[in-house]
């Protein structure tokens, strides 16, 4: 194990200095307590909520915190949501939920569902391209500009039509660090 560790570390060291990486979705600093928690939990499969039921309780609390932060319209005390391991998975889950809701509504109205689209800024998380390819959804991007460093709402609305599933806001635009007005 030590030889394998040294080979991998030597091979990747120059590429894996997070404090020097400003281009991807990585954490550049982590408190020692976060590191300790991760090390202590590395052998647990948190997806198995029957084995680790407290994880479901913590996830529910996090979902409620975010739902309240974003002023969701739900009145019940326990908000609806799903646990995602990373931002790509969270985008996929949210995208599928929005697409299925749009599709169900269109079918109930007797309208076609063959040309769905999503509208978002060009500062989107890259998984949205893959999502749109997988589900055959047209991706409509609103360019970021010097005067609009987050989603330009007026331009986004111009790109919407009856086939628009939703406008996807970005919380933490990679290029600017700013949040779309959610």
Indicate where each model-derived feature is located:
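Conserved active-site and cofactor/substrate-binding residues in soluble primary-metabolism enzymes
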Residues: 33, 53, 57, 89, ...
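Conserved beta-loop-alpha segment that forms the PLP phosphate-binding cup at the N-terminus of a helix
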Residues: 56-59, 63-64, 78-111, 127-131
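Alpha-helix boundary/capping residues
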Residues: 11, 97-98, 139, 163
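Structural motif corresponding to the C-terminal cap of alpha-helices
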Residues: 66, 70-74, 98, 102-106, ...
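N-terminal entrance/gating region of PLP-dependent enzymes' catalytic architecture
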Residues: 1-78
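A generic secondary-structure signal marking the coil-to-beta-strand transition
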Residues: 34, 79-80, 135, 163
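PLP-dependent aminotransferase-class I/II
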Residues: 85-88, 108-181
């Amino acid at each position: 194990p030590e030889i394998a560790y040294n080979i991998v570390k030597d091979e990747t060291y120059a590429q894996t200095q997070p404090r020097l990486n400003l281009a991807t979705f990585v954490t550049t600093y982590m408190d020692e307590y976060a590191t300790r928690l991760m090390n202590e939990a590395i052998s647990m499969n948190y997806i198995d909520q029957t084995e680790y039921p407290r994880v479901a309780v913590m996830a529910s609390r996090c979902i409620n915190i975010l739902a309240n932060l974003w002023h969701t319209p739900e009145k019940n005390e326990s908000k609806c949501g799903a646990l995602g391991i990373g931002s790509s998975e969270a985008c996929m889950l949210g995208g599928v939920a929005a697409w299925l809701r749009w599709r169900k509504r269109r079918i109930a109205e007797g309208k076609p569902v063959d040309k769905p689209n999503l509208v978002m800024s060009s500062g989107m998380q890259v998984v949205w391209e893959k999502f749109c390819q997988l589900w055959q959804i047209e991706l409509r991007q609103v360019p970021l500009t010097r005067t609009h460093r987050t989603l330009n709402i007026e331009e986004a609305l111009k790109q919407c039509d009856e086939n628009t599933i939703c406008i996807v806001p970005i919380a933490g635009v990679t290029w600017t660090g700013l949040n779309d007005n959610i």
